[in-house]
Amino acid sequence: MTVDALSNADNQDLRDNFIANRFLSHEAKLLDQRRFTEWLDLLDDEIRYIVPLRLMALDFDREVRADSFHINDGKVNLKVRAKRSSVSSGWGETPPSRTLRLVGSVMTDRIDQEGVLEVESAVIIYRQRAAIGQGDVLAFRRTDWLRIDGGTVKLLKRVALLTDASLATPNLAIFL
């Protein structure tokens, strides 16, 4: 990126970047505070939430297959997962994970679909489950599609591509 590219950025680009950063920061805070009901309100009814399986390959283009996923959920399944995370019988999250999400390298792009903003970001999540011991670190790149309708912003689709091909965490019960 050159300085000229930055100086030629128009107000729409700056506005889009502000909207995306604000949305992602707010979402991270809700998830870190385990406010899952409020987080679900940020999701579009047509949400697709995808975490593809990553393979070891020499070529980047061959690291992800279109038919292999850790997670491939819609809103109904996300509601079930959120509810399970907030009850004591949800054994995958007992005790509940304490998390800290860092979202950065946010880049936005308008796409052909009316009112939809494509957002790329890099995310690091630190997760601690026990009172003592080492926590987990998950690093990944995300591509989100945000639907902007009037003053409302909703997450329409998320693809989170984990850096690790082999997970060093006991589960993916937390939301990426």
UniProtKB/Swiss-Prot annotation:
Catalyzed chemical reaction(s): a 1,1-dimethyl-3-phenylurea + 2 reduced [2Fe-2S]-[ferredoxin] + O2 + 2 H(+) = a 1-methyl-3-phenylurea + formaldehyde + 2 oxidized [2Fe-2S]-[ferredoxin] + H2O; isoproturon + 2 reduced [2Fe-2S]-[ferredoxin] + O2 + 2 H(+) = 1-methyl-3-[4-(propan-2-yl)phenyl]urea + formaldehyde + 2 oxidized [2Fe-2S]-[ferredoxin] + H2O; chlorotoluron + 2 reduced [2Fe-2S]-[ferredoxin] + O2 + 2 H(+) = 3-(3-chloro-4-methylphenyl)-1-methylurea + formaldehyde + 2 oxidized [2Fe-2S]-[ferredoxin] + H2O; metoxuron + 2 reduced [2Fe-2S]-[ferredoxin] + O2 + 2 H(+) = 3-(3-chloro-4-methoxylphenyl)-1-methylurea + formaldehyde + 2 oxidized [2Fe-2S]-[ferredoxin] + H2O
EC number: 1.14.15.38
Keyword terms, alphabetized: Oxidoreductase, Plasmid
Domain of life, per lineage: Bacteria
Intrachain S-S bonds: none
Pathway assignment: Xenobiotic degradation
Keyword check for Oxidoreductase: yes
GO MF terms held by the record: oxidoreductase activity
Activity: how regulated: Activity is stimulated in vitro by coexpression of a [3Fe-4S]-type ferredoxin.
SUPFAM superfamilies xrefs: NTF2-like (SSF54427)
Enzyme superclass (EC): oxidoreductase
InterPro entries: NTF2-like_dom_sf, Rng_hydr_dOase-bsu
Subunit description: PdmA (subunit alpha) and PdmB (subunit beta) form the oxygenase component of a bacterial Rieske non-heme iron oxygenase (RO) system.
PANTHER family in alphabetical order: 3-PHENYLPROPIONATE_CINNAMIC ACID DIOXYGENASE SUBUNIT BETA, BLR3401 PROTEIN
Function: Part of the multicomponent N,N-dimethyl phenylurea N-demethylase responsible for the initial N-demethylation step during the bacterial metabolism of N,N-dimethyl-substituted phenylurea herbicides. Catalyzes the mono-N-demethylation of N,N-dimethyl-substituted phenylurea herbicides to their mono-N-demethylated derivatives. Is active on isoproturon (IPU), chlorotoluron, metoxuron, monoron, diuron, fluometuron and fenuron, but cannot transform the N-methoxy-N-methyl-substituted herbicides.
Protein name according to UniProt: N,N-dimethyl phenylurea N-demethylase subunit beta
